[in-house]
Amino acid sequence: QALARGAKPIMWSPVERTALAEAEVEYHDRKVPVVWVKFGIDFNAKPIRSRGDFLEISELVNAKVVIWTTTPWTIPANQAVSFNPNITYVAYEVEEVATEAELGFAPYAAVGDRLVLAENLASDVMSSAKVKRFKPLGTVDPHGWTLEHPLYHVGDFFQHAIPMLAGDHVTADAGTGFVHTAPAHGEDDFNVWLATDHTAQEIRQIVDADGRYTDDVPEPLKGLDIIVTSGKKRGEAGKANNEVIRLLAESGNLLGRGITTIRDAHSWRSKGPGSRRATPQSFIARDKPVHAGKTLRELAMKAISDTEFFPPTGRNRLSAMVESRPDWLISRQRNWGVPITLFVNTKGEPHTAALPKDQADKLNANIKAAIEKTGVDGWFATPLESFFEGTGVSAEGWEKVTDVLDVWFDSGTTHAFALRKRGIIDNATGQADVYMEGSDQHGGWFQSSLLESCATRGMAPYKQVVTHGMVVDAEGKKMSKSIGNTIEPDEFQKQHGIEILRLWTASADYWDDTRISDEIIKGTIETYRKLRNTLRYLLGALDGFTPEESLLSAHPREGGDPVRPEAPAFAGESGVESMPGLERFILHRLAELDSEVRAAFQVFDFKRVMTAIVNFVNVELSAVYFDIRKDALYCDPSFATSKAWDEETSVHGNRRRAVRTVMAAVMERLLCWLAPVMPFTTDEAFGESHLKGSAPSVHLLLFPETPAGWRDAALAARWEKIFRVRRVVTGALEVERREKRIGASLEAAPDVIISDKALIDAFAGEDAADLFITSGAVLVQAASGPAGAFALDDTPGIWVVPRLAPGIKCRRSWKYFDPATAMPGFPDITPRDALAVKAWDGAAG
């Protein structure tokens, strides 16, 4: 019902000799000629009424209606002049014009000229025509006027009546208040022509497919091109404009001329200007019922409202296009493509609409059989009569359409043959999860897919639409080989590797145009190196890690450990509650991060994913957690070697076990979260990790579930207080290191003065020296610190007095300790280190 054939002014590319869809049109600034043209009033055509306060007929003798156009080549196709009944029109008489000596050329206007213009535009028009002084004669009513063609003198072809047509598309914002109307070359012109009791058959087609005047147009215009279609000047203005302007001047109907810049339609392929041209084409009507009594426009607008868009602005853009778009032009005039398998009768009706359903079905079956036998060439090669055999319809009076389908129509059917036909989604109600393409596809693939699916199924083919911008250079300029600012993906891959390109994409605001340059890529490489090194560090730290070691997967021992029967049971060995506060804080952050990463992935916000992960790696892992827990990781008794299970050894052994448990949880989540962005790196790390036996590839793992019990807001608040103090201590130690008063932070044992008791209370149960990575630390509450104490302006109420750590340096952990506390047989290492060595020696036999 919605498929129709008809002649309409559609965008045409003379360079390519084909119609253009809206999606194939781009707009560029172009300098064009502008002319003001006079149309004489034909008083003999039919009586002109005088009424009310309007001028008498006698006062309009020799008056001419003025139009303005930037397409002089369309003047030969003029068939009417349009006006708006709501605009006030006035007849003026020219009293003085600029002289040739003043201008350097002879003006086209002359004293005594009578010109009809919109009242509020008269001054601008007169100025453009170099008129110095003019006077109003009175208001006029153009209803019923008939005009003479401005090329009347060229020959009989132009000696036809030019009616005045009332139309709402005429405005008084610019121009003259009258609109030159060539229904073959303008959509508004076409519509007002049909709306005023004229027919499409009366429209003059004087420009051929090559953009040249046809042989119907008299000399000297016949055969002139409106656009150069070949050679070095391809796409430039042809000879038609200049010749039309010359003829207008010769006839005395040129009032003024100039040059202006307009935003003009160009073919996105050839880059040449397009022009509107009325030709027989195939259309899908937007406002006729196509499914369940709903029009295509109604169905599409409803489908858009039911679809998720990322970014959300995509909905507004697509809605605006669908809401305002005219009927869908689906035919093209090319030597290749999918044929439009229609026959049209002498009325221009397609067989699908003109024939009874049973006959149309038989004809369609013959078409299908021919194409199945020999391919799409079967449509063109099979004689017309053969298609009509056995249909009960005579082939006489029918013509085969040789146009091909718009390629956007082809692409818009991908959901049908790529998903529905293959059974991936339900044929009637199935939808693709997501369509992703560039922002230019709101007028292309997104829209053609939407319209095709709505027309056939009444619904969108997708649940979600994701739009990305284009890649631009560091200055925001579009990449162009002529400018030399392009980056070739092949060369990029050879130099940096494809993971860097993926990481750059995921880290950028890809919804908008995205900048890329060597400097930007350097930053991406640093980010990649940091992430890769973090995974490498975790691989080393987790060497030999097994599920039995995990405090999250083990169970509290009842009467002994099945893995190590000799180990006694003790309460709280398993589970989050058994872990030190710092480990529980990292698990809390993993739980927070898990929610954020999942939510961001859900809405395709990859930058948010990467920002959250990179900040976590840089700030909380590398700068804090890994730094603090190096001592426990390197020096605490290990799970595998602990044999001496007295209480102290258990505590130290459990801490290292907790560290490795948390690192394993971090490793698993980082691998899974980063896998979509860094597939090679994560799969390589997965193959070397403790997880390698759990799946053939990291890409076959689901995101691990993160227990709600890991979240602990109160604990997180406590650790935020600890980190605030630690930041000031770290700053003080950096000064000491810079001044060479210490070499490493373990040489220090600072005094920390804190005014807020809540900050001191936050350290309850924690070893401040471990957290500061010093050999000792004293926390003191006081209203202020001593003179000369280190402080940070942005962290008031905390002061640090650096002091050297007393005692001797542990040969194993490098911590300073009181030698009097050393265990027998281990005089030069701390008691903790002595326990670790004993455990190691015991395990070694």
Q: For each predicted feature, which ranges?
A:
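Residue patterns forming the tRNA-binding/recognition surfaces of aminoacyl-tRNA synthetases
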Residues: 2-76, 96, 141-146, 152-157, ...
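Acidic, turn-prone loop/beta-hairpin segments
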Residues: 10, 14, 18-28, 346, ...
